């Protein structure tokens, strides 16, 4: 036992024990509240302009009405980019302005606010529905391609080459709006407009329509018609020039027989196209180039397509053909690199098309694309921009660079077709329990084992079972190979497609999902009938063919990124699975836009997890059901 003098007594705290416990319990709740407020402010943060669609696509000019709160007060002159100096320095007071205001018209009120979730992510922007109704009434008058002032050979090629096998061929809404304007039949009698100094001397057009609406033919038909007309005019001028040169040559021979100067050879048209169509990817070069080549079989013009997937020798032979070239389909980077060494490539261009303009005028392509436009401005007559989505960044660029651009839009712009159904699968529920790969495989197995929803055609009895083709979109290209490998382990015929895939593999895979099956030939029908008679003549039951266990038959799946979401004409695809919820409504439109093409039905399925924005998916689904634009 220690002596009494050595024992140290504990010092009592001035704060009681209950107060200490209460203070420590309040600290975590404050931290949670601060983190929750940080997350909420992060959700409300506005996204970049390139990821948000413009609300004023169809409006030619913007006149914003300034609020009184912006004009008066201590902070009225802050954050201004323009001077806005009034001619009359005296301004009226708010009271006098309020007294002089006209009575408000309730019928002229603005529409209700945008969907809350879509507005939070700054998604697709609206066109006024009054404008949409006016466009509908205008295009209802056009019901046939015969109403367009086209050359007979061009009109015949639309039915025989561009849209073969269709009995009732009618122009789509964007074709009814764009073809007459691009043919200049509405502006024939108008005097040429005087342009201010610094403004481009060529005409500018913006074609904005929903996915799968025939935008390629909307600009290609007028271009081909113009090429043939220019060809006829040039032949007459060439004939006239040859006659004049022959007369001059005879006069020179008579006057100065020994002082005849040698004539310069005429400038060759090799490597000098009339029309250039720019697209962002090599896959779109192959698709658009094939459509251009198909029309040339009957209309007889020279076309070519070049991309980085081709060899240098083939690019040189295509572009610098001695016979010349009329229409060229390529990418901006390849064309810009060729123009540095061969500047005459852009010296004869009269029409320039930017297909998928929202990509070509994005941050990655904009410097090169604008450089090409400036180099062709000397001979350029028309600049045509074409896109299914108009982001705010593109709209702002066009209003500054081309304020007089003619905006040709359709009523269903920024809307997913109503013939496309959207389903939602919650992967948090049983039996998936958060396993996204398992949910994707189960959905594909359910679709593969189900019957075909479309009615059988007249050749169904002579054809084998139809192969179902499904697209699976992921947000990251690293996950494309992983998801495809997992699906193959579950007995599904799956392939992956991303920017890392080789060019040849990309062409082979896309060919299976873009080419619709042709009807069987007469020989195939005869062989199928003969085989059917032989099977019926056997008196006993034939042994069934052994099937591999756990293999899903007659189903092909392509796991891809946004490389296949823009412009690819996937007519053979009837189902799209969104493995992840898209980041923006722009991606929603382009991914689900692989369905519902050429008035066909389609089905989209979204896999929604714990951290996904279910409110966005819900409002997109409601907007699709109502047929409204995703604004």
From Swiss-Prot:
Regions of compositional bias (Basic and acidic residues) in chain numbering: 102-111
Keywords: ATP-binding, Helicase, Hydrolase, Mitochondrion, Nucleotide-binding, RNA-binding, Transit peptide
SMART domains: DEXDc (SM00487), HELICc (SM00490)
SUPFAM superfamilies: P-loop containing nucleoside triphosphate hydrolases
Main location: mitochondrion
Domain Helicase C-terminal: 442-631
Family affiliation: Belongs to the DEAD box helicase family. MRH4 subfamily.
The protein's name: ATP-dependent RNA helicase mrh4, mitochondrial
Main EC class the enzyme belongs to: hydrolase
GO-annotated cellular components: mitochondrion
Catalysed reaction, written as an equation: ATP + H2O = ADP + phosphate + H(+)
Motif DEAD box: where in chain: 355-358
Residue ranges annotated as motif Q motif: 143-176
Molecular function as annotated in GO: ATP binding; ATP hydrolysis activity; RNA binding; RNA helicase activity
Entry remark concerning the domains of this protein: The Q motif is unique to and characteristic of the DEAD box family of RNA helicases and controls ATP binding and hydrolysis.
Transit peptide: 1-39
Helicase ATP-binding domain residues: 196-408
Subcellular location: Mitochondrion
Record EC number: 3.6.4.13
InterPro entries in the record: DEAD/DEAH_box_helicase_dom, Helicase_ATP-bd, Helicase_C-like, P-loop_NTPase
Gene: mrh4
Pfam families: DEAD, Helicase_C
Function: ATP-binding RNA helicase involved in mitochondrial RNA metabolism. Required for maintenance of mitochondrial DNA.
Residues the record lists as binding ATP: 209-216
Residue ranges, annotated region (Disordered): 55-111, 181-200
């Amino acid at each position: 036992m220690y002596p009494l003098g050595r024992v140290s007594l504990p010092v009592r705290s001035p704060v009681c024990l209950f107060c200490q416990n209460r203070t420590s319990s309040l600290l975590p709740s404050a931290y949670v509240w601060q983190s929750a407020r940080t997350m909420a402010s992060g959700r409300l943060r506005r996204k970049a302009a390139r990821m948000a669609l413009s609300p004023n696509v169809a409006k030619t000019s913007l006149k914003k009405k300034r609020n009184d709160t912006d004009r008066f007060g201590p902070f009225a002159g802050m954050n201004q980019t323009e001077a806005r100096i009034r001619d009359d320095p005296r301004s009226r007071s708010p009271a006098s302005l309020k007294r002089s205001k006209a009575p408000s018209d309730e019928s002229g009120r603005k529409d209700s606010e945008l969907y809350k979730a879509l507005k939070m992510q700054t998604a697709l922007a609206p066109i006024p529905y009054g404008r949409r109704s006016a466009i509908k009434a205008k295009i209802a008058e056009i019901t046939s391609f015969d109403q367009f002032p086209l050359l007979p050979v061009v009109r015949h090629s639309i039915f025989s080459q561009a849209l073969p096998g269709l009995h009732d061929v009618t122009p789509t809404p964007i074709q009814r709006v764009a073809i007459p304007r691009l043919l200049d039949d509405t502006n024939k009698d108008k005097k040429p407009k005087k342009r201010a100094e610094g403004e481009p001397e060529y005409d500018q057009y913006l074609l904005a329509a929903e996915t799968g609406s025939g935008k390629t033919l909307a600009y290609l038909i007028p271009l081909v018609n113009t090429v043939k007309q220019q060809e006829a005019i040039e032949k007459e001028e060439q004939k006239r020039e040859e006659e004049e040169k022959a007369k001059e040559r005879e006069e020179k021979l008579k006057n100065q027989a020994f002082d005849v100067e040698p004539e310069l050879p005429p400038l060759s048209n090799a490597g000098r196209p009339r029309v250039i169509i720019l697209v962002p990817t090599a896959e779109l070069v192959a698709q658009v180039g094939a459509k251009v080549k198909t029309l040339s079989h009957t209309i007889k013009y020279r076309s070519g397509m070049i991309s980085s997937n081709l060899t240098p020798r083939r690019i040189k032979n295509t572009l610098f053909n001695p016979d010349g070239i009329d229409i060229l389909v390529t990418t901006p980077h390849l064309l810009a690199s060729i123009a540095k060494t061969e500047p005459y490539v852009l010296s004869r261009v009269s029409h320039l098309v930017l297909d998928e303009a929202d990509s070509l005028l994005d941050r990655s392509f904009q410097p090169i694309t604008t450089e090409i436009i400036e180099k062709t401005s000397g001979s350029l007559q028309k600049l045509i921009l074409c896109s299914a989505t108009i982001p705010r960044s593109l709209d702002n660029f066009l209003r500054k660079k081309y304020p007089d651009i003619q905006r040709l839009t359709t009523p269903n712009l920024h809307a997913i077709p109503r013939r496309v159904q959207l389903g939602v699968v919650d992967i948090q529920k049983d039996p998936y329990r958060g396993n996204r790969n398992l949910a994707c495989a189960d959905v594909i197995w359910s679709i593969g084992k189900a019957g075909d929803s479309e009615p059988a055609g007249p050749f169904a009895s002579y054809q084998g079972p139809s192969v179902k083709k499904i697209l699976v979109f992921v947000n990251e290209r690293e996950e494309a190979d992983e998801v495809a490998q997992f699906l193959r382990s579950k007995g599904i015929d799956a392939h992956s497609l991303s920017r890392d895939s080789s060019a040849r593999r990309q062409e082979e895979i896309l060919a299976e999902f873009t080419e619709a099956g042709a009807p069987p030939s007469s020989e195939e029908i005869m062989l199928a009938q003969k085989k059917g008679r032989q099977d019926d003549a056997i008196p006993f039951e034939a042994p069934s063919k052994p099937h591999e266990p756990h293999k899903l038959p007659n189903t092909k799946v392509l796991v891809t990124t946004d490389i296949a979401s823009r412009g690819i004409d996937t007519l053979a695809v009837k189902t799209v699975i969104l493995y992840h919820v898209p980041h923006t409504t722009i991606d929603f439109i382009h991914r689900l836009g692989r369905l519902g093409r050429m008035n066909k039905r389609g089905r989209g399925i979204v896999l929604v997890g714990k951290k996904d924005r279910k409110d966005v998916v819900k409002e997109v689904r409601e907007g699709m059901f109502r047929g409204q634009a995703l604004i």
